[in-house]
C-alpha cells in the first residue's frame, strides 16, 4: 500500500508529530487530540510505502493507523532515550568528585 502523507508538528510538544493522508488533511483527526496537540504546523509531505524506513516509527504501523483512524500520532522520545545518546563526558559533568 502506498500513501502520500502530510506530517504536522505540534507547537506545544517538542518532537510530537501527526501523520495524515494528504488528501484528507486533518479532517479525520479528533478535536480531542488537536486541543492538547495545538495548531498543527505543516512540516512536509512524503510518500509512505511498506519498504520505506522512518527514523523512529514503524512504517507499517503508521500506514495501518492512517487507514483505520485517519492519523498516526508520533510521540516524543522518552527521557531515557535522550540520556542514552549523550556522550559519557556530559553524563558525568555534575557527578560529585
Curated annotation (Swiss-Prot):
This is YcgL domain-containing protein PSPA7_4096. HAMAP family: UPF0745. Residues 3-87 form the YcgL domain. InterPro entries: YcgL-like_sf, YcgL_dom. Pfam families: YcgL. It comes from the Bacteria. It comes from Pseudomonas paraeruginosa (strain DSM 24068 / PA7). Signal peptide: none annotated.
